[in-house]
Amino acid sequence: MESVLACFQAARAARSPVIVQSAWSEMEPQMITYADLAGLIRCFGARFAEVPFAIHLDHGMSEEECMGALAGGFSSIMYDGSAGSYEDNVTVTRRLRRAAGAGGTLEAEVGRVGGAEGGGGDFEIVKSDPEQLRDFLEKTGADAIAVSIGNFHGSHGVHKGAPKLDFELLARLHDVCGVPLVLHGASGIPEADVRRAVTMGICKVNYYTQLYNVYMDCVRDNCGETMEECMGRATRVLAGEIEKLMDMCGSAGKA
């Protein structure tokens, strides 16, 4: 709840739209259903009525997860078929695009971002191929594409250095792509590189590790306070960090 509130507080302050997202791997341990989270987000959406928002499933790892999110009230889903074969990725993405219908949005992944997503230990990175991307879009009709251009999930310390984005590849991907491109694993990428990527076709930027660390550091620093004071302080700190990122990514002032 605190992170959802922080997203809306930041969006109001920055006058920015916001995509509030979560993965099933984060929801299941907390015993939260898709409908629970969608309902909570819509409650805050009514309170912050001036903020345009979307409810997005991040890294749906199966068709079942994605269909569950749509049934639970999510307006947008990501199907991550990057771990399987290209043919299976195309087949499932195409089915989910039909299931999402005219009112839903489907993000997919071409190549493999890799890294420590969801606490896993798979660090394989396969960069996106422009010709494969062209073929994928023709066959699936996906609305947005997560690209692999040197970015990765999780703490960059695990990878012994900050991500180094391949801007030449990003330009080639943008040239063949008529849909928004998505940058996953933005935590640890230098600010100048994120800003540059946004000018080159990146329209959605995913942050998790950086925001998680800011929030948890504040909780640890203030755990001697009452729970209410501690959580309130951490929520305000998180909102401030999100607001900074909205400005950096160029969405501030666009609501």
Q: What is each residue range found by the language model?
A:
Residues 29, 33, 88, 125, ...:
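Catalytic cores of large soluble enzymes that bind and process phosphate-bearing ligands
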Residues 180:
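Active-site-adjacent substrate-binding region
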Residues 1-26, 34-50, 59-177, 191-207, ...:
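Alpha/beta enzyme core
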Residues 183-187:
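Glycine-rich beta-strand-to-loop/alpha-helix junction loops that act as flexible
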Residues 211-212, 241:
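Short, highly charged low-complexity linear segments
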Residues 219-255:
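Extended, intrinsically disordered, low-complexity segments
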